[in-house]
Amino acid sequence: MRESIEMPKGTFYTIVAICAAIIMMTSMEMLIKAKDTDLFNMWLSTSNLGEDALSQTTKELFSTHLNVCISTFFIRIITPMAVAIHSYFTFTKLRVTKLFVAIWVVIIIGAFALTFLGEQFYSIFFIGSAIGYLALIFAMIYLGKCIRNVRSI
């Protein structure tokens, strides 16, 4: 009985394509958030900026808004980037184990929850990103089933 398998080529390309789609959706959403003045004004009215924000100009507040958008962007794309890079090394040099699948499923669920908790649900890019995360979870579960099928042979 083998505890690890080589990553199937189709599964690797599926995982990388889903990660690319998630990154693209997140990029488009952050681009729209950073450049829309209505969203900036909504951010000003809903955010709890504190006392020092009263003395800042609109230009300084917009700079703060852009920094928040960029920080959020990097936090959201780190997980799909890491999944794609680790899958590449697993596909070319390493083997897939149950531990690989379990750890990435937990991390992807956490990234999905982080995205789900902090977004507007009416955004088409949020919906696309959520579908991408669910597809990535199902791809990892399929990879786990491939390991079980090879082990039972």
What are these regions (language model features)?
Residues 1-38:
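Cytosolic juxtamembrane helix and N-cap/initiation of the first transmembrane helix
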Residues 6, 34-37, 85-99, 135-153:
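Cytosolic juxtamembrane helix at the C-terminal end of the final transmembrane segment
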Residues 22-27, 105-116:
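Aromatic-anchored segments of alpha-helical transmembrane domains
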Residues 39-44, 57-82:
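A loop-to-helix transmembrane entry motif
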Residues 43-50, 151-153:
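Short, highly charged, low-complexity non-transmembrane loops/tails of multi-pass membrane proteins
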Residues 64-71, 95, 117-128:
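Membrane-helix interface and helix-disruption motif detector
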Residues 69-108:
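Loop-to-transmembrane helix junctions at the membrane interface
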Residues 110-153:
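Alpha-helical transmembrane segments of multi-pass integral membrane proteins
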